[in-house]
Amino acid sequence: MAQSNLRPLHDRVVVRRVESESKTAGGIIIPDTAKEKPQEGEIIAVGSGARDEAGKLVPLDVKAGDRILFGKWSGTEVKLNGEDLLIMKEADIMGIIG
């Protein structure tokens, strides 16, 4: 997993989805076609922040390396160097894990 050379603008972040287990606690293997897309990911790049009404730059609350939860339909899917990534606004992030 090479570091992305994509730098998001403003209050956007680049997220790599964290895959869920493909086997249940009871040992049943879940096929890829039945799995939902994970709503958990790791931030790999952050923008510089948004500007407030006075024009002052407000930095983001998240940083590269944070594990986050986001909505099922959040972000825009992009493929970069063969890797599926999401670009989303900080407002689409529901929380930081850990």
From Swiss-Prot:
Subcellular location: Cytoplasm
Domain of life: Bacteria
Transmembrane domains' residue ranges: none
MF-aspect GO terms: ATP binding; metal ion binding; protein folding chaperone; protein-folding chaperone binding; unfolded protein binding
Main location group: cytoplasm
GO biological process: one example: chaperone cofactor-dependent protein refolding
Keywords, alphabetical: Chaperone, Cytoplasm
Keyword Chaperone applies: yes
Family designation: Belongs to the GroES chaperonin family.
Annotated function: Together with the chaperonin GroEL, plays an essential role in assisting protein folding. The GroEL-GroES system forms a nano-cage that allows encapsulation of the non-native substrate proteins and provides a physical environment optimized to promote and accelerate protein folding. GroES binds to the apical surface of the GroEL ring, thereby capping the opening of the GroEL channel.
Quaternary context: Heptamer of 7 subunits arranged in a ring. Interacts with the chaperonin GroEL.
Protein known as: Co-chaperonin GroES 3
Gene: groES3
